[in-house]
Amino acid sequence: MKILLISTCREKLSEYEFVKPIVEIIKYFDYDIINYRNLETLDLHIYDKVIICGTSLQDNDYLNYLFDFNRLKNHGKGILGICSGFQIICSMFDEEIIVQEEIGMINVETQIKNPLASGNFQAYNMHNFSVDKVTSFNVLAKSESTIQMISHKNINAFGVSFHPEVRNQDIITNFLLI
């Protein structure tokens, strides 16, 4: 299996916080890391899975490159968006992004049976934006204040608003097993 990690970090130093922990989870697989600013020249078809990593609260530069992510719609294989990656996946399918700051540990309740997680669990959130409602996605899990996990209704695409690399690494592993 070959995995593509897309860094949404403008600054390379931020990747130590948002990409490297995911690398630790997938380190036994074949993987590449690419920055979001280099997506347009990438051959996506060589990858079996794509993970769009998160970034820091002050780093919103990836929002200027949302159009480039639309190529992922036709990837045909698994996509997982984490934090800013969640927002990117929602934007790809014209879902409305809202201002919704969440920082710290939150309680997450699974809404429907899904391959990523089950039951109730705690997760670490650190984001400025989220979605209030979705039409192209199934809501897999919610917190008291917002949607936390989604799956696209027609393609193999998932999003998590929180950072599973912090306390819920099994979500990333489960995604790779789909």
Role assignments for model-derived ranges:
Residues 23-81, 93:
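Flexible gly/pro-rich beta->alpha loop and the following alpha-helix that scaffold active-site loops
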Residues 82-86:
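Active-site loop->helix "elbow" adjoining a glycine-rich segment at hydrolase catalytic centers
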Residues 87-88, 106:
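Short gly/pro/ser/thr-enriched loop/turn and capping motifs at secondary-structure boundaries
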